[in-house]
């Protein structure tokens, strides 16, 4: 019958509510608020069919104000912001413009591009212009970055310059250093260099996505070939994997030593990494001998660990290989299980896409909210809401001279707008629940198919038809509530971990040692709890697929079964995981080496096809990580197969004794590994033997 019906009902209601949440967010949200920058009046820059259609860049009247601490609080710069068609390309001040305007009318035509729309009075006194904020007091050579005008910084011989100048006029009669501009730019961009790296990385993805996709397809084909070979030659192939990894790591040690030796004696190669600090060009680190020494030492430690594990666990490795051979036979009988990860991937992609779209629409919900921005530390109106239409006539401008009524964010006073943050948290929690349910559904489906293989007395004759489809149908029809229950427990723990990570990020600058220590302990505890729940859920789903009981009963039975066989679990299961991990490393490593030679233009045949990149390691790391995840998806089928067969084997040992009435269901190879035998039936008469021969026919 159905298990955990109450949780199933709650799960269905939550899904319906999630659909309603997405619909409401879609009705209220506007992704343009995320895509386009917004000026001080809440208008989009660059939006078609608006006055700003040809003005796609945001310009700051006084970017020096962006170094104010209020930027960190309000995420807005306390100065007027306008949409412009292009950034200024020269130094100029309003005072100099007025002086030259008497001789050259063209100076005003250029300067007024950066004034408020409709303002056309270059003779207006500078004091009144700055009071009414009709025009900026100065402009500096800038370039667009993230659709915003930022000073065009260039470092020449270690000196920071803007348009080959190290100083400028600030429009108030003072000479300022361009370092002040950099500090202001950093205040609003939150580490401009990091964002520049992000832009270059995005450009690299845009130019190399096709080749990244080819690399991932190659890794998928290699993974499939690896699994097919494993079906027939598990022992030989895995020993080749082991020695292949040892050889690859050994080559890495030799290559690092060769690079380390070749850098000896070269100028500046003995500089330490701490001396040069963080560099956006990672090729700088490859010119340091210390970098290659660290690589060589790390690889040597990895090599030693692998060799020691093989020496002390060689007998257990043989047992694990035999268990994998049995798993290979099971997958050979149910080949459709190899392609089930595709279903899981599509379901996960659907969950991720729905969550991301809902999050964007929630973030872009609401009307424009304006707040008072002031550079005066004692202004009591700072950060309060205001109306830009009536702000100039209010008392705020008198009590806080120079204050601005600036667009802050999109929000509102309705019940929906007040609880957008709570809705975002709900969006995240339900997303985690759906993702974990999808993974649980896959695990239970595979476990049911492999359990059907194990409990077939005559393999493959007694295996039911379409075991994977049957297991999938049973899991959805009878055990949706149990799978949702286990997924919910795991999702809550993951949700708490995300909150702890957020708090840790916010408290990085705190000096309270006890708070940091407590937070670190909580993160460690919940990390351990998450991994324990994942392990128990996996085995609980196997028990559900075998006995069809509810989640709590299955989890309890699985836990005590594993505790009664803790040594077998600790050795056999983990050695199997280790061997599969080596296979993932070999696949991702070999595809990664191929990608390295391709993106560094070391393959002459296709050298001209390589796109021009800012950082070749961007597509390289993407291919390596993607290859590892693809191999991980395919090998998860094997891991689930081995775990299911192993759990079934433990149950077989406890429920049966090898007698004629209770024979072992395990195959002969597993019985040989553990020295177990089925008792022979006593000698029978010819008639009895004849009846015995006819017995299988009677079962059908």
Curated annotation (Swiss-Prot):
Stretches in topological domain Cytoplasmic: 1-4, 231-233, 314-341, 456-482, 563-577, 638-687
GO biological process entries: choline transport; transmembrane transport
Glycosylation sites noted in the Swiss-Prot or TrEMBL record: 157, 164, 383, 395
Record's compositionally biased regions (Basic residues): 677-692
Membrane topology, record value: Multi-pass membrane protein
Any one Gene Ontology cellular component term annotated for this protein: plasma membrane
The keyword Transmembrane is assigned to this record: yes
Record topology, Extracellular segments: 26-209, 255-292, 363-432, 504-541, 599-616
UniProt similarity note: Belongs to the CTL (choline transporter-like) family.
Region (Disordered): 676-700
The reaction(s) this protein catalyses: choline(out) + n H(+)(in) = choline(in) + n H(+)(out)
Gene of this entry: slc44a5b
GO molecular function: antiporter activity; choline transmembrane transporter activity; transmembrane transporter activity
Keyword check for Metal-binding: no
Record's protein name: Choline transporter-like protein 5-B
Purpose of the protein: Choline/H+ antiporter.
Residue ranges of the TM segments: 5-25, 210-230, 234-254, 293-313, 342-362, 433-455, 483-503, 542-562, 578-598, 617-637
Location in or out of the cell: Cell membrane
Organism of provenance: Danio rerio
Keywords (A to Z) from UniProt: Antiport, Cell membrane, Glycoprotein, Membrane, Transmembrane, Transmembrane helix, Transport
């Amino acid at each position: 019958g159905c298990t955990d019906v109450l949780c199933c009902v709650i799960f269905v209601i939550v899904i319906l509510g999630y659909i309603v949440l997405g619909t409401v967010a879609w009705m209220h949200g506007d992704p343009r608020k995320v895509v386009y920058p917004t000026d001080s009046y809440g208008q989009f820059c660059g939006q078609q069919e608006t006055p700003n259609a040809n003005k796609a860049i945001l310009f700051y009247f006084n970017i020096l104000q962006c170094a104010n601490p209020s930027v960190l609080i309000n995420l807005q710069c306390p100065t007027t912001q306008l949409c412009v068609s292009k950034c200024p390309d020269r130094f100029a001040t309003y005072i100099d413009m007025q002086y030259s305007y008497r001789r050259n009318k063209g100076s005003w035509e250029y300067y007024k591009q950066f004034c408020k729309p409709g303002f056309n009075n270059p003779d207006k006194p500078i004091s009144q212009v700055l009071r009414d904020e009709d025009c900026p007091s100065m402009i500096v050579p800038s370039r667009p970055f993230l659709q915003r005008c930022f000073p065009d910084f260039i470092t020449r011989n270690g000196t920071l310059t803007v348009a080959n100048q190290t100083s400028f006029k600030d429009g108030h009669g003072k000479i300022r250093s361009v370092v002040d501009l950099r500090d202001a730019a950093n205040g609003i961009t939150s580490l401009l260099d990091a964002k520049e790296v992000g832009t270059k990385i995005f450009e690299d993805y845009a130019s190399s996505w096709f080749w990244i996709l080819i690399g991932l397809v190659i890794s998928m084909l290699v993974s499939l070939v690896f699994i097919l070979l494993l079906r027939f030659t598990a022992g030989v192939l895995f020993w080749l994997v082991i020695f292949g990894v040892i050889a690859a790591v050994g080559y890495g040690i030799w290559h690092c030593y060769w690079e380390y030796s070749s850098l000896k004696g070269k100028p500046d190669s003995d500089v330490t990494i701490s001396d040069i600090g963080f560099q956006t060009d990672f090729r700088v680190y490859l010119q340091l001998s210390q970098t290659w020494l660290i690589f060589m030492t790390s690889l040597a430690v990895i090599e030693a660990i692998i060799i020691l594990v093989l020496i002390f666990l060689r007998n257990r490795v043989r047992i694990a290989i035999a268990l994998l051979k049995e798993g290979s036979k099971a997958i050979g009988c149910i080949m459709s299980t190899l392609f089930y990860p595709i279903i899981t991937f599509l379901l996960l992609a659907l969950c991720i896409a729905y969550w991301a779209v809902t999050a964007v629409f929630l973030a872009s919900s609401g009307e424009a909210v304006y707040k008072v921005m002031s550079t005066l530390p004692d202004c009591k109106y700072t950060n309060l809401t205001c109306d830009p239409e009536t702000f100039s006539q209010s008392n705020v401008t008198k009590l806080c001279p120079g204050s601005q009524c600036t667009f802050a964010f999109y929000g509102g006073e309705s019940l929906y707008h007040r609880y957008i943050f709570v809705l975002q948290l709900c969006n995240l929690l339900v997303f985690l629940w759906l993702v974990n349910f999808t993974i649980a559904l896959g695990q239970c489906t595979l476990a049911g198919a492999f359990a059907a293989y194990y409990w077939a007395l005559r393999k493959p004759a007694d295996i039911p038809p379409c075991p994977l489809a049957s297991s999938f149908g049973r899991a959805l029809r009878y055990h949706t509530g149990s799978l949702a229950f286990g997924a919910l427990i795991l999702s809550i723990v993951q949700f708490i971990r995300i909150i702890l990570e957020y708090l840790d990020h916010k408290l990085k600058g705190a000096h309270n040692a006890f708070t940091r220590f407590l937070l670190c302990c909580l993160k460690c505890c919940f990390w351990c709890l998450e991994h324990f729940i994942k392990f128990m859920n996996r085995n609980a789903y196997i028990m559900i697929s075998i006995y069809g009981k509810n989640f709590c009963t299955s989890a309890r039975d699985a836990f005590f079964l594993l505790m009664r066989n803790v040594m077998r679990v600790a050795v056999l299961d983990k050695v199997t995981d280790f061997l599969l991990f080596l296979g993932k490393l070999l696949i991702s490593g070999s595809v990664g080496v191929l990608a390295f030679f391709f993106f560094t233009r070391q393959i002459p045949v296709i050298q001209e096809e390589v796109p021009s990149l800012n950082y070749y390691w961007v597509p390289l790391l993407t291919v390596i990580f993607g290859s590892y995840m693809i191999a991980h998806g395919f090998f998860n089928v094997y891991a689930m197969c081995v775990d299911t067969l192993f759990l079934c084997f433990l149950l077989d040992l406890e429920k049966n004794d090898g007698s004629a009435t209770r024979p072992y269901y395990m195959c002969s190879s597993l019985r040989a590994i553990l020295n177990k035998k089925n008792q022979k039936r006593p000698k029978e008469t010819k008639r009895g033997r004849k009846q015995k021969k006819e017995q299988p026919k009677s079962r059908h």
